[in-house]
Amino acid sequence: MTAQPNPIINQEFLFALLREAAPSGYERRAADVWKKEAATFARVSEDHYGNVYAELGPEDGPAVALLGHLDEIGLMVSHVGDEGFLSVLAIGGWDPQVLVGQRVRLLAPDGDILGVVGKKAIHVMEPEERKNASRIEDLWIDVGLSKEEAQARIPVGTYGVIEQGPLMVGDKIVSRALDNRVGAFVVLEALRLLQGAELKHRVVAVGTSQEEIGSYGAQVGSYRLQPVAGVAVDVTHETGQPGVSEKKYGVVPFGSGANLAVGPMTSPVILRQMITAAQASGIPYTLSANPRLTHTDADTMILSRSGVPSAVVSIPNRYMHSPNEMVDVRDVKACIDLLAAWGRALEVGTDFTR
Protein backbone atom coordinates (compact mmCIF):
# COMPACT_ATOMS: atom_id res chain seq x y z
CA MET A 1 0.00 0.00 0.00
CA THR A 2 1.32 3.43 -0.92
CA ALA A 3 1.65 5.83 1.98
CA GLN A 4 -0.47 8.96 1.73
CA PRO A 5 1.36 12.31 1.41
CA ASN A 6 1.82 14.05 4.73
CA PRO A 7 -0.01 17.40 4.80
CA ILE A 8 2.23 18.88 7.50
CA ILE A 9 5.35 19.12 5.33
CA ASN A 10 6.29 19.13 1.65
CA GLN A 11 6.78 15.37 1.57
CA GLU A 12 7.15 15.20 -2.21
CA PHE A 13 10.18 17.50 -2.14
CA LEU A 14 11.77 15.79 0.86
CA PHE A 15 11.38 12.34 -0.68
CA ALA A 16 12.84 13.59 -3.97
CA LEU A 17 15.91 14.75 -2.04
CA LEU A 18 16.19 11.47 -0.16
CA ARG A 19 16.03 9.34 -3.31
CA GLU A 20 19.17 10.93 -4.74
CA ALA A 21 22.64 9.55 -4.04
CA ALA A 22 24.88 12.30 -2.69
CA PRO A 23 27.91 11.06 -0.74
CA SER A 24 30.40 13.66 0.47
CA GLY A 25 32.18 15.10 -2.54
CA TYR A 26 29.49 13.92 -4.98
CA GLU A 27 26.50 16.03 -3.93
CA ARG A 28 25.47 17.08 -7.43
CA ARG A 29 22.33 14.97 -7.72
CA ALA A 30 20.76 16.16 -4.47
CA ALA A 31 22.00 19.71 -5.09
CA ASP A 32 20.19 19.80 -8.44
CA VAL A 33 16.89 18.75 -6.83
CA TRP A 34 17.32 21.34 -4.06
CA LYS A 35 18.27 24.10 -6.48
CA LYS A 36 15.35 23.37 -8.83
CA GLU A 37 12.90 23.62 -5.95
CA ALA A 38 14.55 26.79 -4.62
CA ALA A 39 14.30 28.47 -8.03
CA THR A 40 10.50 28.38 -7.80
CA PHE A 41 10.51 31.13 -5.19
CA ALA A 42 14.03 32.45 -4.48
CA ARG A 43 17.21 33.76 -6.08
CA VAL A 44 19.57 30.83 -6.56
CA SER A 45 23.30 30.37 -7.12
CA GLU A 46 26.06 27.82 -6.47
CA ASP A 47 29.81 27.67 -6.01
CA HIS A 48 32.64 25.49 -7.25
CA TYR A 49 32.67 23.43 -4.05
CA GLY A 50 29.19 21.98 -4.41
CA ASN A 51 27.22 24.37 -2.19
CA VAL A 52 23.88 25.67 -3.46
CA TYR A 53 22.29 28.92 -2.27
CA ALA A 54 18.75 30.33 -2.20
CA GLU A 55 18.01 33.80 -0.89
CA LEU A 56 15.23 36.25 -0.15
CA GLY A 57 15.29 39.80 1.15
CA PRO A 58 17.24 42.89 0.09
CA GLU A 59 20.19 41.94 -2.11
CA ASP A 60 22.39 44.55 -0.42
CA GLY A 61 21.25 43.67 3.10
CA PRO A 62 23.40 41.95 5.74
CA ALA A 63 23.36 38.19 5.22
CA VAL A 64 21.94 35.61 7.59
CA ALA A 65 22.88 32.03 6.71
CA LEU A 66 20.76 28.93 7.27
CA LEU A 67 22.92 25.85 6.63
CA GLY A 68 21.81 22.27 6.05
CA HIS A 69 24.23 19.79 4.55
CA LEU A 70 23.21 17.80 1.49
CA ASP A 71 25.88 15.12 1.69
CA GLU A 72 25.56 11.69 3.24
CA ILE A 73 28.01 9.06 4.39
CA GLY A 74 29.06 6.70 1.63
CA LEU A 75 31.67 4.35 0.24
CA MET A 76 34.52 4.63 -2.26
CA VAL A 77 35.96 1.81 -4.34
CA SER A 78 39.64 1.30 -3.53
CA HIS A 79 40.47 -1.96 -5.34
CA VAL A 80 39.09 -4.52 -7.80
CA GLY A 81 40.12 -8.06 -6.80
CA ASP A 82 40.87 -11.11 -8.92
CA GLU A 83 37.29 -12.37 -8.90
CA GLY A 84 35.75 -8.96 -9.55
CA PHE A 85 34.97 -8.28 -5.89
CA LEU A 86 35.36 -4.63 -4.91
CA SER A 87 37.15 -3.38 -1.81
CA VAL A 88 35.85 -0.10 -0.42
CA LEU A 89 36.77 2.63 2.03
CA ALA A 90 34.36 4.58 4.21
CA ILE A 91 33.29 8.13 3.41
CA GLY A 92 32.27 9.42 6.82
CA GLY A 93 31.53 7.51 9.99
CA TRP A 94 30.17 4.05 9.27
CA ASP A 95 29.43 1.28 11.73
CA PRO A 96 30.50 -1.63 9.48
CA GLN A 97 27.94 -3.93 11.14
CA VAL A 98 25.08 -2.14 9.38
CA LEU A 99 26.67 -2.60 5.95
CA VAL A 100 26.60 -6.39 5.88
CA GLY A 101 24.12 -7.72 3.31
CA GLN A 102 23.02 -4.27 2.14
CA ARG A 103 22.42 -3.38 -1.48
CA VAL A 104 24.73 -0.67 -2.79
CA ARG A 105 24.42 1.82 -5.64
CA LEU A 106 27.76 2.61 -7.29
CA LEU A 107 27.90 5.90 -9.16
CA ALA A 108 29.99 4.65 -12.06
CA PRO A 109 31.02 6.90 -14.99
CA ASP A 110 28.78 5.16 -17.55
CA GLY A 111 25.77 4.65 -15.32
CA ASP A 112 24.88 3.40 -11.86
CA ILE A 113 25.65 -0.20 -10.97
CA LEU A 114 23.96 -2.13 -8.18
CA GLY A 115 25.80 -4.57 -5.94
CA VAL A 116 25.60 -6.19 -2.53
CA VAL A 117 27.91 -5.99 0.46
CA GLY A 118 29.41 -9.42 1.07
CA LYS A 119 30.90 -11.06 4.13
CA LYS A 120 31.94 -14.59 5.01
CA ALA A 121 28.81 -16.52 6.06
CA ILE A 122 28.60 -17.55 9.70
CA HIS A 123 28.59 -21.23 8.65
CA VAL A 124 32.17 -21.04 7.36
CA MET A 125 33.58 -18.93 10.18
CA GLU A 126 35.83 -20.34 12.85
CA PRO A 127 34.39 -20.04 16.39
CA GLU A 128 36.74 -17.18 17.26
CA GLU A 129 35.80 -15.28 14.08
CA ARG A 130 32.15 -15.27 15.10
CA LYS A 131 33.00 -13.20 18.17
CA ASN A 132 34.61 -10.40 16.17
CA ALA A 133 32.83 -7.32 14.91
CA SER A 134 33.01 -6.75 11.17
CA ARG A 135 35.62 -4.34 9.87
CA ILE A 136 35.13 -2.52 6.61
CA GLU A 137 38.34 -4.06 5.26
CA ASP A 138 36.78 -7.52 5.78
CA LEU A 139 33.80 -6.66 3.56
CA TRP A 140 33.48 -6.48 -0.19
CA ILE A 141 30.97 -5.47 -2.84
CA ASP A 142 29.77 -8.11 -5.29
CA VAL A 143 28.48 -6.64 -8.57
CA GLY A 144 28.27 -9.92 -10.45
CA LEU A 145 31.03 -8.97 -12.90
CA SER A 146 34.37 -10.49 -13.79
CA LYS A 147 37.56 -8.69 -12.83
CA GLU A 148 37.94 -7.38 -16.39
CA GLU A 149 34.35 -6.16 -16.59
CA ALA A 150 34.51 -4.57 -13.14
CA GLN A 151 37.79 -2.79 -13.87
CA ALA A 152 36.41 -1.47 -17.15
CA ARG A 153 33.18 -0.13 -15.64
CA ILE A 154 34.04 0.71 -12.02
CA PRO A 155 37.34 2.60 -11.69
CA VAL A 156 39.09 3.11 -8.37
CA GLY A 157 37.54 6.18 -6.73
CA THR A 158 33.96 5.34 -7.73
CA TYR A 159 31.48 6.59 -5.12
CA GLY A 160 28.71 4.48 -3.64
CA VAL A 161 25.77 4.69 -1.26
CA ILE A 162 23.40 2.22 0.34
CA GLU A 163 20.43 1.52 -1.93
CA GLN A 164 17.51 2.40 0.34
CA GLY A 165 14.66 4.78 -0.46
CA PRO A 166 12.29 6.76 1.80
CA LEU A 167 8.97 5.63 3.22
CA MET A 168 6.44 6.65 5.85
CA VAL A 169 5.99 4.48 8.95
CA GLY A 170 3.03 6.04 10.68
CA ASP A 171 3.98 9.68 11.15
CA LYS A 172 7.69 8.83 10.98
CA ILE A 173 9.92 9.20 7.93
CA VAL A 174 12.38 6.35 7.38
CA SER A 175 15.28 6.57 4.94
CA ARG A 176 19.03 6.53 4.52
CA ALA A 177 20.59 10.01 4.36
CA LEU A 178 18.12 11.75 6.66
CA ASP A 179 21.43 12.90 8.13
CA ASN A 180 21.26 15.42 6.77
CA ARG A 181 19.06 15.71 3.74
CA VAL A 182 16.29 16.59 6.18
CA GLY A 183 18.32 19.58 7.43
CA ALA A 184 18.82 20.85 3.88
CA PHE A 185 15.06 20.44 3.42
CA VAL A 186 14.29 22.36 6.60
CA VAL A 187 16.38 25.43 5.72
CA LEU A 188 14.77 25.75 2.29
CA GLU A 189 11.25 25.22 3.61
CA ALA A 190 11.88 27.84 6.30
CA LEU A 191 13.00 30.25 3.60
CA ARG A 192 9.82 29.47 1.67
CA LEU A 193 7.77 30.60 4.68
CA LEU A 194 9.55 33.96 4.56
CA GLN A 195 8.13 34.81 1.14
CA GLY A 196 6.25 38.09 1.35
CA ALA A 197 7.73 39.03 4.72
CA GLU A 198 9.37 42.43 5.06
CA LEU A 199 12.82 41.04 5.65
CA LYS A 200 15.53 43.32 6.93
CA HIS A 201 18.28 40.85 6.12
CA ARG A 202 19.32 38.90 3.06
CA VAL A 203 18.29 35.48 4.33
CA VAL A 204 20.26 32.74 2.57
CA ALA A 205 19.46 29.04 2.79
CA VAL A 206 22.49 26.94 1.89
CA GLY A 207 22.63 23.29 0.95
CA THR A 208 26.20 22.60 1.98
CA SER A 209 28.67 19.96 0.84
CA GLN A 210 31.12 17.68 2.63
CA GLU A 211 29.91 18.04 6.21
CA GLU A 212 30.41 14.35 6.90
CA ILE A 213 34.16 14.59 6.27
CA GLY A 214 34.89 17.95 7.92
CA SER A 215 32.27 20.64 7.13
CA TYR A 216 34.38 21.97 4.30
CA GLY A 217 31.41 23.22 2.29
CA ALA A 218 30.23 25.28 5.23
CA GLN A 219 33.68 26.80 5.52
CA VAL A 220 33.65 27.85 1.86
CA GLY A 221 30.05 29.07 1.98
CA SER A 222 30.47 31.09 5.16
CA TYR A 223 33.57 32.80 3.79
CA ARG A 224 31.64 33.71 0.65
CA LEU A 225 28.51 35.03 2.37
CA GLN A 226 30.15 36.85 5.31
CA PRO A 227 26.95 36.47 7.36
CA VAL A 228 26.26 38.51 10.47
CA ALA A 229 24.64 35.42 12.01
CA GLY A 230 24.02 31.83 11.06
CA VAL A 231 22.19 28.66 12.00
CA ALA A 232 23.23 25.09 11.22
CA VAL A 233 20.37 22.62 10.98
CA ASP A 234 21.28 18.98 11.51
CA VAL A 235 20.05 15.88 13.33
CA THR A 236 20.62 14.79 16.91
CA HIS A 237 20.09 11.52 18.76
CA GLU A 238 16.48 10.84 19.71
CA THR A 239 16.47 9.67 23.32
CA GLY A 240 13.32 7.54 23.34
CA GLN A 241 15.21 4.61 21.79
CA PRO A 242 17.01 1.99 23.91
CA GLY A 243 20.55 2.75 24.97
CA VAL A 244 20.65 6.51 24.30
CA SER A 245 21.36 8.39 27.52
CA GLU A 246 19.19 11.34 28.49
CA LYS A 247 21.92 12.29 30.95
CA LYS A 248 24.26 12.87 28.01
CA TYR A 249 21.98 13.99 25.18
CA GLY A 250 19.12 15.61 27.06
CA VAL A 251 15.44 14.68 26.96
CA VAL A 252 14.87 14.61 23.21
CA PRO A 253 12.05 12.17 22.35
CA PHE A 254 10.06 12.16 19.13
CA GLY A 255 7.44 14.90 19.14
CA SER A 256 9.47 17.22 21.39
CA GLY A 257 10.12 19.70 18.59
CA ALA A 258 13.28 21.56 17.65
CA ASN A 259 16.39 20.76 19.67
CA LEU A 260 18.63 23.75 20.48
CA ALA A 261 22.31 23.35 21.30
CA VAL A 262 23.71 25.16 24.35
CA GLY A 263 27.46 25.54 24.71
CA PRO A 264 30.60 27.61 24.21
CA MET A 265 30.60 27.27 20.41
CA THR A 266 27.08 28.63 19.97
CA SER A 267 25.78 32.17 20.40
CA PRO A 268 23.85 32.77 23.63
CA VAL A 269 22.21 35.77 21.96
CA ILE A 270 20.76 33.68 19.13
CA LEU A 271 19.75 31.00 21.63
CA ARG A 272 17.74 33.55 23.62
CA GLN A 273 16.17 34.83 20.40
CA MET A 274 15.24 31.30 19.37
CA ILE A 275 13.66 30.53 22.74
CA THR A 276 11.70 33.79 22.64
CA ALA A 277 10.48 33.06 19.10
CA ALA A 278 9.49 29.51 20.04
CA GLN A 279 7.58 30.58 23.13
CA ALA A 280 5.82 33.41 21.31
CA SER A 281 4.68 31.09 18.52
CA GLY A 282 3.96 28.00 20.60
CA ILE A 283 6.68 25.98 18.88
CA PRO A 284 7.93 23.02 20.95
CA TYR A 285 11.65 22.86 21.65
CA THR A 286 14.23 21.16 23.86
CA LEU A 287 17.77 22.01 24.97
CA SER A 288 20.92 19.88 24.80
CA ALA A 289 24.31 20.61 26.33
CA ASN A 290 27.25 20.82 23.90
CA PRO A 291 30.27 21.65 26.08
CA ARG A 292 32.78 21.35 23.22
CA LEU A 293 32.29 21.12 19.45
CA THR A 294 28.78 20.78 18.03
CA HIS A 295 29.90 18.33 15.30
CA THR A 296 27.84 20.26 12.76
CA ASP A 297 28.47 22.88 10.08
CA ALA A 298 28.33 25.48 12.84
CA ASP A 299 31.84 24.52 13.93
CA THR A 300 33.42 25.91 10.75
CA MET A 301 30.92 28.74 10.24
CA ILE A 302 31.69 30.06 13.72
CA LEU A 303 35.38 30.47 12.80
CA SER A 304 34.88 32.01 9.35
CA ARG A 305 36.71 35.30 8.79
CA SER A 306 36.37 37.29 12.03
CA GLY A 307 33.77 34.88 13.40
CA VAL A 308 30.06 34.29 12.82
CA PRO A 309 27.63 34.15 15.76
CA SER A 310 25.94 30.80 15.22
CA ALA A 311 23.31 28.44 16.57
CA VAL A 312 22.47 24.79 16.03
CA VAL A 313 18.90 23.57 15.55
CA SER A 314 18.50 19.80 15.36
CA ILE A 315 15.85 17.25 14.43
CA PRO A 316 15.66 14.19 16.72
CA ASN A 317 16.82 11.15 14.74
CA ARG A 318 16.88 7.42 15.47
CA TYR A 319 19.44 4.99 14.01
CA MET A 320 21.84 7.67 12.78
CA HIS A 321 24.34 6.65 10.10
CA SER A 322 22.38 3.55 9.21
CA PRO A 323 20.43 2.53 6.10
CA ASN A 324 17.16 3.28 7.90
CA GLU A 325 17.25 6.46 9.93
CA MET A 326 13.97 7.75 11.37
CA VAL A 327 12.57 11.22 12.13
CA ASP A 328 9.17 12.48 13.23
CA VAL A 329 7.24 14.79 10.91
CA ARG A 330 6.18 16.95 13.87
CA ASP A 331 9.79 17.70 14.78
CA VAL A 332 10.69 18.53 11.18
CA LYS A 333 7.79 21.00 11.05
CA ALA A 334 8.79 22.56 14.38
CA CYS A 335 12.30 23.25 13.07
CA ILE A 336 10.92 24.85 9.90
CA ASP A 337 8.56 27.07 11.87
CA LEU A 338 11.21 28.09 14.39
CA LEU A 339 13.72 29.18 11.76
CA ALA A 340 11.07 31.20 9.96
CA ALA A 341 9.88 32.85 13.19
CA TRP A 342 13.45 33.76 14.13
CA GLY A 343 14.18 35.11 10.65
CA ARG A 344 11.12 37.36 10.67
CA ALA A 345 11.95 38.83 14.06
CA LEU A 346 15.69 39.42 13.61
CA GLU A 347 16.57 43.11 13.70
CA VAL A 348 19.38 44.74 11.75
CA GLY A 349 22.16 45.88 14.04
CA THR A 350 21.56 43.21 16.68
CA ASP A 351 24.44 43.11 19.14
CA PHE A 352 25.65 39.50 19.24
CA THR A 353 28.33 40.19 21.86
CA ARG A 354 28.39 37.47 24.48
Q: What name fits each language-model region?
A:
Residues 1-354:
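N-terminal hydrophobic/helix-forming segments and targeting peptides
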